[in-house]
């Protein structure tokens, strides 16, 4: 499912899903990068106003955690090769949750490389592995990193509990250090069994 910023949904059901190996990797192409400036959905002043608004809401108790995000956008050339970008990401920034989707019939082309597994489902069992806390080494993690991870685990437990059998939700791992090229993340595992 792809959701635009405006809220439009595109759902794609694949007949088959195969893990990529050397034989399935996209062909090498010429990824030439993007030239010219990127656009941001927030100015610095708008971002700072958003931070102040969040602080007020946290102090008032109306929110627990907020991720203030902005959209970076760039005009794309007509001859853009998303598969080439996907291959470049795979070679230079290998990530456990990487992929390339080419579905031109519905206007979807995605190259992604993420260290985070938002949600997996195996039969009736679901697991989320949120990441909060990033440093160059595990020893450089700050108390703030552990506190943020515990906070997101609490939120994920609450969210999963809404659709899982009572008593089945648990934290299988808390604040596990997971190494990636050039950095370490704190990762926790939250799981439960879906209500049938």
Spans of model-derived segments:
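Extended alpha-helical targeting/anchoring segments
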Residues: 1-196
């Amino acid at each position: 499912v792809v959701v635009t910023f405006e809220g439009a949904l595109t759902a794609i059901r694949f007949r088959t899903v195969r893990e990529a190996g050397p034989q399935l990797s996209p062909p090498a192409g010429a990824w030439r990068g993007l030239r010219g400036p990127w656009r941001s959905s927030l100015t610095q002043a708008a971002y700072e106003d958003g931070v102040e608004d969040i602080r007020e809401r946290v102090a008032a108790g109306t929110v627990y955690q907020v991720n203030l995000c902005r959209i970076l956008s760039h005009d794309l050339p007509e001859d853009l090769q998303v598969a080439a970008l996907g291959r470049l990401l795979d070679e230079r920034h290998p990530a456990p949750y990487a992929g390339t989707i080419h579905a031109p019939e519905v206007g979807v082309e995605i190259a992604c490389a993420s260290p985070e597994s938002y949600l997996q489902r195996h039969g009736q069992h679901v697991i989320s592995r949120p990441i909060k806390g990033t440093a160059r080494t595990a020893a450089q993690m700050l108390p703030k990193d552990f506190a943020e991870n515990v906070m997101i685990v609490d939120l994920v437990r609450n969210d999963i509990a809404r659709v899982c059998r009572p008593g089945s939700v648990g934290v299988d791992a808390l604040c596990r250090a997971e190494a990636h090229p050039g950095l370490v993340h704190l990762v926790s595992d939250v799981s439960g069994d879906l209500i049938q």
